[in-house]
């Protein structure tokens, strides 16, 4: 058995494996929840509905050197689901999210049914206080990857937070994100300019006070419910 040295960077396209397959392929992976509880004293841990990508960054934490970076291609499910909210709260105890990149023009991988995102983050000390002034960039690619001739130029624009014909960039501080979260805006909304929203918070009304929402139901025989005119 050989002790591997810690690395400064990890770049990975993690597999997209649904919750149902996780138990078969790696039944011990959910032991990570025990580790998270021990290290963070968190009351909530990763949901049973989580894809496998939600577990792996926490394993990477001990492999990465101090202030090391991860670049992970993930399903976009973490941006707007219940288990994604828990994942976000937990991963930010281990890493400072620097930027999130999505496609605004089609999927990146034709052989994948899921929509992908790129998350770039820096390792932090779990016990360190949160820096509310630190900013996170939310980047939207305007062109398909295969149509972008100079990927290095695009990468530089993203790193420098410089908008161009190829990428739109919105940047929010942790303090601003907390404000938006309190309003009820999920992370999937931060790729748009929402700087105006906190100013009208007092004028907003919870739609549940006006409408009653129910979950849609799937039926096997749609013709029964949609008769011909």
Provide a role label for each language-model segment.
Residues 2-227:
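Signature of N6-adenine DNA methyltransferases within the class I
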